[in-house]
């Protein structure tokens, strides 16, 4: 489409929009007194008519000013261009709008007709006449006289006559000014409610009539126009005698209404005013104010004496509808009273409507000549009817007296367009005399008439006219050909050959019809089918024989009546529906759609199920099938029935269709793993396995069918190094890379199995535990590792965004868990690094302390000593708690006074069975000074604990680790060629290369006597009530160089343990660091200590995180039963024989106490003896005299257990020299005759293991395997001097006698972080086999040791 065509279409559309209403209004603003030929506006542009091309019009566009004959318009318009100009007529606003209120706008209106007829519109143009300042304000008189009494108070105000300005707005009165007032008077201007400005004279000084009785000055008034206009008047003020009172109107505002036809002399209103004066001053005079208009003064009369207002001349509402009468009441004084009377003139139907004919088509001798072929709606004249009356009296209608081919169409209020309503025909009517009638709505109505003459010019312009403008016929379908439908006819107003008509089918007529040219008969020539075509719409033409011929047409609508000649049709011959088996009863199965080409009742189809099938129902109207049963695919997979469709014809037709309903499976089952059967199974993967080898196959089944049962596998967690891959269809897990050392251990691979169900896939996950190792030597440990590992979250793969659920909530939970795990690991790592850096170096000054004496016990400390402990509540309650009480008794035999008295120190110990392994020994401080020796080694042991029973009286809230502090002169640590520690130093604290900074705590200590026992009792079965074992130890004699008298001392250790701890151990191995915490029943450590966090892989020169001494977070479980006792009291001879080289160098355990100073040369002399509560040794290895042992673990609080052999209760089940739960143990541990390294041993409850052999006089075994505690063995009591060995009972040498002093001590809680002191509590010492002296009042007699 080119630009010109687009412009044309746009112009036509715009013209349709512009002229759709038939009339428009356009407003312009002009100023009064404008000169001639001033351009006001351009209708062609202002009405957007310039977009209409002239070539689309029959004639050129024309603008014609429509005005009343005889009027002189104030504007003119160019007919070709539409430009509006002023004429020579004066535009005077004050004259044109003299009768309207001053606050209303002044308009001048004209009408413009836009021709030709195809775009004809009548435009009413309203000119808003703006006021100019062409009038000056004037006072009502040039001299204004006013009287003021001489007693007027200062600031008294007197109203002056106001000036009048015909202009409005700012051009009106704006300001008053007093000239030459001599400062006696001032002027103020107030504004009345009507908006008028009133001047008031103000008395500014006292007046004295005798001094001066007259003042003359000028008053000036100004308007606000530009240029400003003003006028002046002389103001003469007379000073009069005093007039005390002023008149007062009874009513200051009065509003009355009076009809405009009221006769002259009719009373309008009566004013009343009063004056309190008497005499002449009381006489009141009424008058109109000078603000009252001249018209009001002419129409109304005011009685000056009575105040009665009457009609002076006839009123005319059409001239002035209301009048404002300002009445003044004066008593001769200078302060008249004011009252406003508003007179509303009501309308009376006293005006006849007037008819104003303004021709659009120019008349010739007052007659309009029209051609008979002019188009319809040709505009002839604008008829304006007016009535000066108001309301319904001024509402006028206009009409013609009889039927004529013309009509009046309203365009504006009381304005009508006279236009042709039909084609004119010269042959029928040559002239028209149109009588126009105008009538108002008054009662009675008044009317007016006017005549308008039209003459018709003859032309051949009449076309045939059909008698019907629209022809409608109906015929049933399946008709016989040749049936006549209807006959059309047309007439022609012309005469002669122009009136002869021929009938023709229009070009849109279908071939099924034919038309007789002369008669106009319409006939059907073919059989009709409503289903193919239900209606026909075409035209019939009528053509005359004139020259040129004229034609007309009529539209024919043929409707085909339906017959029931079609049966209902199903959209499918057979319907197959698939429904889920969980579809509820009365749910929607499907929809049967049926169509019927017929119409009405013939197409109203009703559906039903044949054969009385009660399992399903069908909606007879909508075709929705619903079940009356619940589906079960396993019972019946499909249902078949027939549906009947029947229409509603008089002779109904029907059809049927087969319906099959198939019950399909629903994805309501998750895949279930059958391999592995649970998260606790595992598979061994050899490190030598080649990449690409299938190491395991997972298998999951889905109880659904089809795609819902198709399972796909994927690894979604645990495979952080991508060591394994899985086949998503077979479930084969393949090793992707060659395993190295870092890959050894347990791998928890999280495998996800999801089905292919739609729309939602279901899935399950399983943990596949792949144990990368050469063999599985300890299945119990692996099972325990697997069980423990299930409590920790599996690390997700980096590429897996969500392994548990597709929802964002599980993603958030997973991210939070991973972040928390990483945070904990980082904190533990940082803490371990800081603690390791705090390990003190060796202090050489310890060498000077080897010959130090023990601290002298204080015999006065006879009461129980309470020690503070840390109060830290655990976040998670442990599942089981084991409460142990260690009672250390000491008998002094050297002093006669203390004979038979023993001091017993009860130390409560908490043990967690499963949660203890979670305690971090690295981050938990111990009770030792940073540079003190590692005393924890003396109280940690790798020996398993026997089965103990928890008794109700077991105290609550007790710690599960008890550390005995050494005396200031520490004889428990010595230095030689092997040890790096010194036992002699000026420092009051002994120094160990392996010490850790610790936090102290206190425990309660009770002192009581207990008789010694001289036999060794061992229990190999769970203890029912209580079991007591006493081991007497005879320490080695002191070196002669020390010059000390060897005293005899014995040490008694009593264990109070809770009931229920007699579970047997299933595995005696040491825990792997990566294996997770184990239960206390494993007996890897004494008293069921969890092993995984207490010990770690380490070299002999490094401490591990297991070097803590106490667990401040231990808790107790209420409901404990009576405690059992195990008392170990060796004799002096036994103790001396059982002291080993390690006891002489590194200190003594409870079974082996020695004097303070020991000779280094004795380290090669001592032999270790083992007192145990377990069966004999299971194996002994080849003897080696070179010590391969890299590290030795002692009972209770010892360093890492990674390379340790423990006595009692836990022999290795398979391997001889290594415990299965600790990977580095393969290099462990042949026992030897030389002392171990600096970190080798600690104080023990049994002899140190470094040189332990079968307890006999034979050479020590090269390897000693921890004795295994068996549930099947019974309790055996051994006589003094005999123990159970590998080959039976072994003799213990009792010939060595020694003297040793023992000392009790406690650990007090630090009062300040810098306080590293260890408080030593002196207690009474005793000698073994010395009888205790009688006590006084149940309290043993204590005496201080002579040393």
Curated annotation (Swiss-Prot):
Bilayer topology annotation: Single-pass type I membrane protein
Keywords: Calcium, Cell adhesion, Cell membrane, Glycoprotein, Membrane, Repeat, Signal, Transmembrane, Transmembrane helix
Domain Cadherin: 26-139, 140-249, 250-355, 362-466, 467-570, 571-673, 677-795
Stretch forming the signal peptide: 1-23
Ranges of the Extracellular topological domain: 24-812
Region (Disordered): 1057-1091, 1097-1116, 1325-1347
GO biological process: cell adhesion; homophilic cell adhesion via plasma membrane adhesion molecules
GO MF, any single term: calcium ion binding
The protein's role, per its UniProt record: Potential calcium-dependent cell-adhesion protein.
Protein name per its UniProtKB record: Protocadherin-11 X-linked
Protein source organism: Pan troglodytes
Lineage per the UniProt record: Eukaryota, Metazoa, Chordata, Craniata, Vertebrata
